[in-house]
Amino acid sequence: MTEDNHVLVKVEDLKMHFPIYRGVIQRQVGAVRAVDGVSFEIHKGETLGLVGESGCGKSTTGRTILQLYKPTAGKIFYEDTELTTLRPEKMRQMRKNIQMIFQDPYASLNPRMTIRDIIAEPLVAFGSATGKAIDERVRDLMKLVKLDPDFMLRYPHEFSGGQRQRIGIARAMANNPTFVVCDEPISALDVSIQAQVINLFEDLQKELDLTYLFIAHDLSMVRHISDRVAVMYLGIIVELADRNEIYANP
């Protein structure tokens, strides 16, 4: 739940257009306006739910906030830092604070890496820990997401979908981020597992003081976890309100 009115993430008139090329010389003949002028704020400690039908641009919005896509136009702020103007090295350092949890737990984990190496990857990349400290941190992270640390030398194929998603969550938490984009993190899971993962997200938010952008199409789950909900349609936000208000007066 939101702690105060402190704005952690601010998005101003965000646009992400993908060019369409045709012909032998690949001339641009148009563009797909995946995100077409989106603006919103996310307060510290809050969960903002972002919902909409497939293809409406919600996942593109999340990926563009993290600069996985370079926006066509608009501004994105984390605290007082404008992400859209950061140089690559500065943006790389910023990724300690902002992380993403992907939709597909089967595709987002390298099948050739052990769970230990997968979770430790951000620690190694940023030099956050070395030697035995890495193993200790991995064990702590596995406990945090309710996985047995004794399984750290196993491979992704030895785990269920729900367990794989927990591994992805542990990896995202490795460098103690403050803002996490959750890109439909439960849509690929069995219904029986979805509630457990949602509860884990809520527990982590309370324990680690996290702020979420929670992208989903399951309205009941979004209502359960979100403080406010934004509804997206054809690249724009058509409604943004408190979760109870938006469900009472859709």
List the predicted regions and their residue ranges:
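ABC ATPase NBD coupling module
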Residues: V24-V29, K70, L83-Q99, D117, ...
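Helix-to-loop junction immediately C-terminal to a conserved catalytic motif
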Residues: L66
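Conserved ABC transporter NBD signature motif
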Residues: G74-E82
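Conserved ABC ATPase "signature" region
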Residues: E82, K132-D150
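Conserved ABC ATPase signature
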Residues: Y155-F159, Q163
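A short, proline-enriched helix->beta-strand linker immediately N-terminal to the Walker B motif
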Residues: A174-T178
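P-loop NTP-binding/switch modules centered on Walker-like glycine-rich loops
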Residues: P185, L189, I193-P250
